[in-house]
């Protein structure tokens, strides 16, 4: 499994290759915040003043650093993304692949950045900045957002394009009469039980987004003394849905904690028409060498 040391080496190489003051400043700040790949609105404003650039120009300059977080043992193809929240915060994302598992377990960079922002408490994404044109899977995933109609996509070669330009005549949650969509506040009530890690899994399951299957699902990881959670984000097209273990592993990686050992994994699911138990158990065993503790609530 790639280590934090490998991430640091990649970033150092990018800094040397780019020889760009923005890249250097971003890398320095990442090191100061222990490689937690989220930047406050205040930090973003400071850089915009310092380098006399817009939010989008700043995010475009950040892409080579964001791509350093990629985990790509299969493709060796590094994709970096920056989701800009309506709060003004920047959230990095990167693609992640898992050996010895079905390729459907892959995390796309746009999914990574969006899930990162969602778990961090962001309320909407205004802009998605990415170093390669979004694939159809990601275009459909972004169409689930509460900001889908106004979301702008920015690439190194083309900026200020609305999502609908990449996904004309789209199919989405409104076609299935879903009013509260991804990033809208969800209100579900699940009974708490068990120890703190189990309770965390239940609480994060209650915050998941599953309007089609009604199968709420959450994961809690014991990472040293910290609990890191991930939750399910469903999609109107079903296949682009984002699974809770990927969500948790992604958040751990982007929090700069990929070196910290995971000692336990708890999954909580409500009884619905689907289950992510088997896929999550397979990934937990092959990628982490751990048994997944499962509860139905």
UniProtKB/Swiss-Prot annotation:
It catalyses: cytidine + H2O + H(+) = uridine + NH4(+); 2'-deoxycytidine + H2O + H(+) = 2'-deoxyuridine + NH4(+). Binds 1 zinc ion. Its cofactor is Zn(2+). The keyword Zinc applies. One of its GO terms (molecular function) is zinc ion binding. Its EC number is 3.5.4.5. Keywords: Hydrolase, Metal-binding, Zinc. The keyword Lyase does not apply. CDD domains: cytidine_deaminase. PROSITE patterns: CYT_DCMP_DEAMINASES_1 (PS00903), CYT_DCMP_DEAMINASES_2 (PS51747). GO terms for biological process: cytidine deamination. GO terms for cellular component: cytosol. Pfam families: dCMP_cyt_deam_1 (PF00383), dCMP_cyt_deam_2 (PF08211). Residues 54-174, 192-297 form the CMP/dCMP-type deaminase domain. It is an enzyme of class 3 (hydrolase). Zn(2+) binds at residues 108, 135, 138. The active site is at residue 110. Belongs to the cytidine and deoxycytidylate deaminase family. This enzyme scavenges exogenous and endogenous cytidine and 2'-deoxycytidine for UMP synthesis. Homodimer. HAMAP family: Cyt_deam (MF_01558). This is Cytidine deaminase. The gene is cdd.
